[in-house]
Amino acid sequence: MARFFRRRKFCRFSADGVVQIDYKDIAMLKNYVTESGKIVPSRITGTSAKYQRQLSTAIKRARFLALLPYTDSHK
């Protein structure tokens, strides 16, 4: 029987040496928001606690400035 091994999750921000997460980088922020508009938890993305806090504030700022939607399009 073949076993399936999950890839180890790692923080991409720590690996890339990011100091501060920018709220204007919409393409990067969209990777951490679901289709319905929710912020993806760190246990799924593997983001460290420090960068998860920065990520959530960056997403909330982008939403406030209408760069990101709060919810999906409700079709």
Swiss-Prot record:
- Chaperone is among the record's keywords: no
Task: Provide this UniProt record's keywords sorted from A to Z.
Answer: Ribonucleoprotein, Ribosomal protein, RNA-binding, rRNA-binding
Q: Which domain of life is it from?
A: Bacteria
Kindly give the InterPro entries that the UniProt entry links to this protein.
Ribosomal_bS18, Ribosomal_bS18_CS, Ribosomal_bS18_sf
Listed GO MF terms: small ribosomal subunit rRNA binding; structural constituent of ribosome
Q: Which residues cross the membrane?
A: none
Q: Tell me the SUPFAM superfamilies matching this sequence.
A: Ribosomal protein S18
The record's annotation in Gene3D superfamilies points to: Ribosomal protein S18 (4.10.640.10)
**Keyword Metal-binding recorded:** no
Protein purpose: Binds as a heterodimer with protein bS6 to the central domain of the 16S rRNA, where it helps stabilize the platform of the 30S subunit.
Q: How does it assemble?
A: Part of the 30S ribosomal subunit. Forms a tight heterodimer with protein bS6.
Instruction: Say which family it is in.
Output: Belongs to the bacterial ribosomal protein bS18 family.
Q: What name appears for this protein in its UniProt entry?
A: Small ribosomal subunit protein bS18
